[in-house]
Amino acid sequence: MKIFAVRIGNKYGPEYEDYLKRKLPEYDLNWIREPINSKIQLQWNKMHVMSLDLNEPICIIDIDILLVNDYKKLFEYPIERGEFVAMPGWWREDQSYVINGGFFKYYPKDCKYIYDKFMSDVDHWQSFYIKNGTTTGPVNGEQHFVEDSVKERLKLKTIPNSWVTRWCSNSNAIAGKDYEQWQFKTSLKYQSLTNNK
C-alpha cells in the first residue's frame, strides 16, 4: 500500500520522516516535499494525491502522527470503491465537522473531482473556511474542504473513536484555552466515547 505524507517548510525536520520510515517499513512511503503548485500552501498539497491515476486505495497521513499500539490496523482498515475513510475529530467542541485531516484512506480515482474542484479556484478554497469562521488561519481548512467535498459523492466512514486522540505537548497548540482544563475535558470525553475508564 502507498502512504503519502506532506513535509513542506521547516516546521518539521527529517526526524519526522525517519520516525515514519521506522514504524512503516513494509509500506511504500511517498513524501511531498515541494508544493505541487506555487499557490498551494503547506497541508493543502495533500490534494495532489487525489489526482493520481491509481486503482488501489492509498493513505495520506500528517507528518506528525504518532503511531502506537496496534497501529497497522489503521492502514489496513477496510475500504471499498465509493468510500472515503478518515480519522474522526471527536475532541472538537464544534461537531459540525466530524473528520480530522491526520489520516485519510481512499481510491484516488474516486476523489479526482475533489482535486479538480480545489484546483479550479485554489485561492478561494484555501481561504474559504478561515473567512467563514470555521477555522483559524493563516493556513487551515483543508480537512473541512475535503469533508464537504466527500459528502457530495462518496460515503464517508470514520475509524473507531477509540483508535485516535489528540495530544498537545504545549499550550500554544490550543490558543485561547486553559491548557490543563482542555486536557482534562479531552480525557473525560475520550473515556465517555470509549467506555475506557
Label each residue range with its predicted role.
Residues 62-66:
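The conserved acidic donor/metal-binding loop of glycosyltransferases
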Residues 1-43, 54-55, 108-109, 153, ...:
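N-terminal anchoring/stem segment of glycosyltransferases
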Residues 45, 99-101, 141:
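A conserved catalytic-core signature of glycosyltransferases
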Residues 58:
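Short aromatic/hydrophobic "clamp" motif used to bind/position activated sugar donors
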Residues 95, 99-109:
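Substrate-binding rim/cap in mid-to-C-terminal beta-strand-loop elements of soluble/periplasmic
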Residues 67-99:
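Conserved donor-nucleotide/metal-binding helix-loop-beta segment in metal-dependent transferases, i.e.
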Residues 107, 112-197:
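Catalytic core and acceptor-binding pocket of nucleotide-sugar-dependent glycosyltransferases
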Residues 46-51:
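Short, conserved alpha-helix that lines the donor NDP-sugar binding/gating region
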